[in-house]
Amino acid sequence: MSDRAETPSVREPFNAIEVRILGCLIEKQATTPESYPLTLNALVLACNQKSSREPLMNLASGQVGQGLRQLEGRSLVELVMGSRADRWEHRLDKALQLTPPQLSLLGLLLLRGPQTVNELLTRSARLYAFDDGEELQHQLERLIGRELVCRLPRQPGQREERYMHRLGSAEDLEELLAARATQAAVNEGAAGGRIEALEARIAELETRLAKLEEDLGSGEPRG
């Protein structure tokens, strides 16, 4: 697939429910192909899954159904009529002209928020088998070049850069960055408090040790 430009409607920001729907459809297409496309009930369960999701959500079927209709209006999902139940499939790879490795990365970022290269490499194993982190990094750079992904500023205490999708609104991005900056400050403060407590404990032990040595040194030898 090429990196040609997509239609403007595709790049209009998604809301949080639409982001979750697309991420779930991408994930389940790769991990449970026998049950894909998904019924509405299966998609609701996937959206509310307690593992591999950030943030956790508790969506009603009506909310998911409305999100599907909005995405269908932008040709990003398609209804597949079935004899027992109607099912839904995504068309994000076609709409954005994504290769399989790019689709897997975007799906992970939609589902789990900002992640490091190592986190993406570990978590992508079920979706796409990257040879190594270098290959994954190359695909991230291509997505960055198309403004589908961005590299986040490193927060205090973080050793690796994190990457985030850019399919949500600018307000969502700012809110997430603010929340993560606050959490980083809290973590740093907590770590600082623990260090101060340890230093105080060490100083106390050193004082007690010095006194013990002094007492032993002043004692008279036994004959």
Swiss-Prot record:
Q: Name one Pfam family in it.
A: DUF480
* Record's signal peptide: none
The protein's name: UPF0502 protein Avin_04790
Q: Which PANTHER family match?
A: UPF0502 PROTEIN YCEH
InterPro entries given in the database record:
DUF480, WH-like_DNA-bd_sf, WH_DNA-bd_sf
UniProt lists the family membership as follows: Belongs to the UPF0502 family.
Q: Which domain of life is it from?
A: Bacteria
